[in-house]
């Protein structure tokens, strides 16, 4: 059974603000893939004072939609759930616009033997796992570093009521 107030994401429009519930809005980036399904969802929690979760990939249309969605609002925090190329790259732009604290697990360290580019022979891979030629490749955003590092399972609350 579907939650009655949550609209399905299958046919959600790209780069448009969708009201998911009274205090949550969503903007979907136009980056459909096997990793992001219909596209990466950026969530805005609150009404005037807001927290942005997963600013998203570096797509002009997504950045412009976020800019419009946040116009006249006070961004009090930016939360990055994980540092993949479809979730964190617009964080720097949003931080530059708002100065809001960036919360995330990170920064990612590069360990000896870490392979940034995949150079293995893909001829033996399962064809179902293949990335379409126009599909964005999933990578780790090694440049991202939060202001406040959180650990797995940690919870945090605003001392302010979202208004």
For the regions a protein language model found, what residue spans apply to each?
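Conserved beta-strand hairpin/beta-sheet module of binuclear metal-dependent hydrolase folds
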Residues: 10-11, 15-72
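Accessory terminal helices/loops
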Residues: 1-16, 118-122
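Short gly/ser/thr-rich secondary-structure transition/capping motifs
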Residues: 7-10, 26-29, 34-35, 144-152, ...
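Intrinsic structural disorder
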Residues: 3, 11-13, 19-21, 81, ...
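Short beta-strand segments
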Residues: 51, 162-163
């Amino acid at each position: 059974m579907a939650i009655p107030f949550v609209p399905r994401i299958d046919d959600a429009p790209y780069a448009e603000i969708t009201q998911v519930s009274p205090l949550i809005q969503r903007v979907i980036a136009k980056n459909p893939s096997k990793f992001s399904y219909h596209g990466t969802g950026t969530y805005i929690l609150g009404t005037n004072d807001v927290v942005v979760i997963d600013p998203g990939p570096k797509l002009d249309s997504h950045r412009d939609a976020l800019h419009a969605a946040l116009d006249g609002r006070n961004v009090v925090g930016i939360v990055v759930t994980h540092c993949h190329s479809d979730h964190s790259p617009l964080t720097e732009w949003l931080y530059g616009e708002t100065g809001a604290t960036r919360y995330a697990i990170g920064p990612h360290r590069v360990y000896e033997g870490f392979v940034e580019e995949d150079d293995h022979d893909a001829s033996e891979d399962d064809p179902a796992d293949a990335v379409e030629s126009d599909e964005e490749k999933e990578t780790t955003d090694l440049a991202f570093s939060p202001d406040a590092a959180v650990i797995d399972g940690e919870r945090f609350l605003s001392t302010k009521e979202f208004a």
